[in-house]
Each structure stands twice: as structure tokens, then as C-alpha cells.
């Protein structure tokens, strides 16, 4: 199931998490999946622009009540920079994964971090593949100009996964 909504604050994300089905033996695994925020150029390892840094701070605000305990980003600087404000606030290390290995990332999350809340920073061409690798329906592709998507994937004890599609921060606009 994919639902879409605009996220105006951390309370909505916390509400989505609170509505996740509870399992007596183990909490559901919740994975927040975002694309890195705005970058300065199309270079292969471009860093974040001022707009991207501002959106990264907004992501920190929106996820403040989400109980995030694990951070994953690809090997690219912009994906890691997107999570730095959250890592600094929570005192967490950003775990690096291969951007081309969505299946490996999903396996690592489900094996090593079951029952936790995980935040993943990916790319326009990996975000929906990560959602699908976690067992949820694959959302439509993320456009290259689109930076405001936040996918909340909840995986229950039996492995059933659902996804809620939110937006955060200033709306992305098509060029």
C-alpha cells in the first residue's frame, strides 16, 4: 500500500510511526528513506548546496521525534551530508553502503536492525529500489529534480511491508 501526503512537521512522522502495527515480541522495523538533498552540481560526487544544507536541517527537524537509531548513506558525500545534522544531534555514526546494492542494504537492515527505526539517504535512482527491496510496493520513480520525498516503510513481524509516501520541507519544483 502506498499513501501520499505532505509532511509539515515531525509530529506527522511520529504519528505514522505510532500507527505502525505493534508486535508483542518485537517492534516493527521502520525505515525512513529519502533522497539526498539538493547538490551544487551534476558532478559524480557533488556536495550539498546551501539549499540542500537547509533541507538537511529540515529533515533533522521532521525526524526529531521518530526514534531513529541507525543511519545509512551511500558512499557519496551528498548522501552522507544529508544525514550529518541528524548524526550530530543523536551522536550516531553514519553507516556507509554501496549505492548500487539496494538488496544488500535491505538484507543488512532486516538482519542487523530488526525492530529499530532506520534512516537511509539514497539517490533519485536508488530510493524506490530500496523501498522495494524492503518488501514494500515500489513507488513511481523519483525525478532528478525531486528532493522532498520521504518514504516510511514499516515491516511487521511476519515480513509484511507497507509504505507511506510523504513530502517534507519546501516543495521541489520541476525546472
Predicted regions and their residues:
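N-terminal secretory signal peptides that target proteins for export/translocation
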Residues: 1-4
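Bacterial N-terminal signal peptides
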Residues: 9-18
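Signal peptide processing junction and immediate N-terminal pro/mature segment
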Residues: 20-25
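Active-site-proximal alpha-helix that buttresses catalytic centers in soluble enzyme cores
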Residues: 26-114, 127-129, 133-141, 146-156, ...
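Short beta-strand segments
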Residues: 121-123
Amino acid at each position: 500500500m502506498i499513501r501520499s501526503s505532505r509532511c509539515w512537521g515531525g509530529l506527522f512522522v511520529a504519528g505514522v510511526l505510532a500507527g505502525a502495527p505493534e508486535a508483542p515480541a518485537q517492534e516493527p522495523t521502520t525505515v525512513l528513506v529519502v533522497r539526498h538533498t539538493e547538490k551544487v552540481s551534476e558532478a559524480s560526487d557533488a556536495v550539498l548546496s546551501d539549499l540542500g544544507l537547509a533541507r538537511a536541517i529540515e529533515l533533522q527537524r521532521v525526524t526529531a521525534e521518530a526514534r531513529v537509531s541507525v543511519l545509512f548513506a551511500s558512499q557519496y558525500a551528498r548522501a552522507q551530508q544529508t544525514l550529518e545534522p541528524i548524526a550530530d544531534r543523536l551522536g550516531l555514526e553514519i553507516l556507509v553502503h554501496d549505492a548500487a546494492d539496494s538488496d544488500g542494504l535491505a538484507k543488512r537492515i532486516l538482519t542487523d536492525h530488526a525492530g529499530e527505526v532506520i534512516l537511509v539517504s539514497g539517490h533519485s535512482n536508488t530510493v524506490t529500489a530500496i523501498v522495494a527491496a524492503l518488501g514494500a510496493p515500489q513507488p513511481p520513480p523519483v525525478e532528478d529534480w525531486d528532493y522532498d520525498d520521504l518514504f516510511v516503510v514499516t515491516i511487521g513481524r511476519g515480513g509484511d511491508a507497507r509504505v507511506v509516501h510523504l513530502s517534507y520541507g519546501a516543495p521541489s519544483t520541476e525546472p
